[in-house]
């Protein structure tokens, strides 16, 4: 298996103006476009959090997207990524918005 094909899982939390600006919808759409699986949800702290799973090259692209792009009306202050690990199989079959 090539390096870019290694499956990884990583948790994320995005800080800034990320609620009420369709951030979850755009995150889900971008994740699906890249073929990633996982989830995204708003938190009570005014952040957005979730988990990404997929090939490391696609996860890296999505991490950069979460740090720098987001939804058109969002303003991202920072993105935290943690608990990254190599996985043998995906835990999810889709990219879901969790309410």
UniProtKB/Swiss-Prot annotation:
**Which Enzyme Commission number(s) are on file for it?**
3.6.1.7
- Write out the GO MF terms: acylphosphatase activity
**Enzyme class per UniProt:** hydrolase
Which domain of life does this protein belong to? Eukaryota
Residues annotated as domain Acylphosphatase-like: 9-99
Identify the catalytic residues. Answer: 24, 42
Protein family (similarity comment): Belongs to the acylphosphatase family.
The name this protein carries in UniProt is Acylphosphatase-1
Q: By which gene is this protein encoded?
A: Acyp1
